[in-house]
Amino acid sequence: MHKYQTHWVEHSIVKILSSTGKKHIALMAGGMSAEREVSLVSSEGVSKALIELGYRVTFIDMGADIAVRLQEIKPDIVFNCLHGTYGEDGCLPGLLNIMRIPYTHSGVLSSALAFNKIHSRIWFLTNNINMAESIVVNKSDNIKNDPMKRPYVIKPLAQGSSIGVEVIFAEDDFNFADYDFPYGDQVIIEQYIKGQGRELQVAVLNGKALGALEIKLLKNRFYDYETKYTEGFADHLCPAPLPANLYEKLLIESEKIYKTMNCKGPARAEFILEEQTNKLYALEINTHPGMMPLSIVPEIAAYAGINFTNLIEEIIKTASFES
């Protein structure tokens, strides 16, 4: 199991990437979260697209002095390319609301809800979104045996990119009493959809589902961090090979989640399809989907006729702050 940590960084790193342009975009990336490297790689393609679109671009690797840096450079818009803690969890949108700087991606409540697996689950179920059975386990519970019948999934409360996610199968030599809660004192224990469960991903932009793809695992047992970011570990079947009525239902459910959570800009909804019953189980909605070469939202957007540069332009158009 990988152990990724949040690193406290005192000072932001500011780099001018383009000094002329129609508007000044601060491209926020890196930061202090466990997903720092993913964010930095995502920002590379985004920066090229912004410059191609004619924007003045300043890159900011976010540190604790971010408010001071933003006051100094005075951007017209912040493109939030951060993943994980402080960027994806509602913290940065809260600061930008106070500073009245328009920003891309979802706002405070939407981001915070989506990032926290307990609260997003409550929200989903309240809005009649089907999910697999799950329970919350606290470190202080001192549970010695399996908290749920195997197979089950262990999910950290607030991590992205499948960091810290483990699937415990019946044959695994695993003792829950030895689990050390590496990402906080609470975890979600979720039923693993057995057999022919199919991993489905939907890209949503401005409330409209652009399409869906299916993840076919080639090496690892589940869609973990390594599989997500290593070429050759999974195939993407785009569009997802589903009957027309089921494909349409998948898009409608994704739009419902997006709208009930009041998301903004791009998002990626994740589902498991139980093939024996054709039942869809929602996993989560990601309000800060990756923008890397292997990333799903750009791939689905391309299938829908939106190239990467135009996708970034559409995201910029959604920039606003909450008053």
Curated annotation (Swiss-Prot):
Which InterPro entries does the record cross-reference, listed alphabetically?
ATP-grasp, ATP_grasp_subdomain_1, D-Ala_lig_Van_CS, D_ala_D_ala, Dala_Dala_lig_C, Dala_Dala_lig_N, PreATP-grasp_dom_sf
The scientific name of the source species is Rickettsia peacockii (strain Rustic)
- Please explain the role this protein plays, according to its UniProt record: Cell wall formation.
Recorded catalytic activity of this chain's protein: 2 D-alanine + ATP = D-alanyl-D-alanine + ADP + phosphate + H(+)
Name the cofactor(s). Answer: Mg(2+); Mn(2+)
Q: What is this protein called?
A: D-alanine--D-alanine ligase
* Alphabetized HAMAP family for the sequence: Dala_Dala_lig
Pathway assignment:
Cell wall biogenesis; peptidoglycan biosynthesis
Q: Report keywords, A-Z.
A: ATP-binding, Cell shape, Cell wall biogenesis/degradation, Cytoplasm, Ligase, Magnesium, Manganese, Metal-binding, Nucleotide-binding, Peptidoglycan synthesis
Q: Where does Mg(2+) 1 bind?
A: E270, E284
GO MF term list: ATP binding; D-alanine-D-alanine ligase activity; metal ion binding
What the entry lists under NCBIfam families is as follows:
D_ala_D_alaTIGR (TIGR01205), PRK01372.1 (NF002378)
